[in-house]
From Swiss-Prot:
It comes from Rhodopseudomonas palustris (strain BisA53). One of its GO terms (cellular component) is cytosol. This is UDP-N-acetylenolpyruvoylglucosamine reductase. One of its GO terms (biological process) is peptidoglycan biosynthetic process. One of its GO terms (molecular function) is UDP-N-acetylmuramate dehydrogenase activity.
Amino acid sequence: MNFPDLIPDLKPAMPELRGRLLANAPLAPLTWFRVGGPAQLLFTPADENDLAYFLARLPKEIPVSIVGVGSNLIVRDGGLPGAVIRLAARGFGETRVDGDVIHAGAAALDKRVAETAAAAGIGGLEFLYGIPGTIGGALRMNAGANGGEIKDVLEEATGIGRDGSLHVFRNAGMRLSYRKSGVDASVIFTSVRLRGAIAPPETIRAKMDEVQKHRETAQPIREKTGGSTFKNPPGQSAWKLIDEAGCRGLRVGGAQVSELHCNFLINTGDATAADIETLGETVRDRVKTHSGIELQWEIKRIGIAA
């Protein structure tokens, strides 16, 4: 489907806009599942000031969504009304070192942040090497893996509010918990400051190699997937609950529960977003029936049905 083109009405109010603004832009190529409809508006800001300028002048009735590299995301088949913001590496992907602190733009890949830290002999960020996506997305959901999470290393984060205002958050003020941030969802994170601990680079690299080896042997990283689908319930492993409910290999249309890791859904080639979401809900129902436990989605689902 196509949405009404809003650009002719918006552009006159934004004469100094420097980023790229598109109407009815395909989102499927921007997600790891490779499914979903278009964005009514897709804006790629030139930098933080450009993002603030755009948001301040965007009519308040137009909803705003943020999309990173699409690694933990289902965009529904009807697409996404309103404005979708996508932070690009140019303008938001820088990483730099200051002592035992890593400064990173929100579009920097988690893996790159870990590599930057390792090269500088900064330990404690190895867990990021195994997390797909960008540091902005990791910050939003307090991402974690292999015994570490963002909350452990975060010093400060910067973001832009829906009205274009600048916000700076310290760790405690973000109220980070398991796969959750307490910061208002309308804030778009633009940069982060992470603190590690000085350590021998070879020790850090060895830990990162272990993380990568585990991913390659235990996760379907070469499939069209969104990463871990459901949060682990307290004291439980989501994959084990899914397996025990008989869902390993379960299919709906072109979507399948991974045979390798049950907490991963994959697009076998011709899945729709509806196939993937329906499969996820089927898994949730079967797990609830089998164990009485209600799994919570970890993957973000946005947009409207076709």
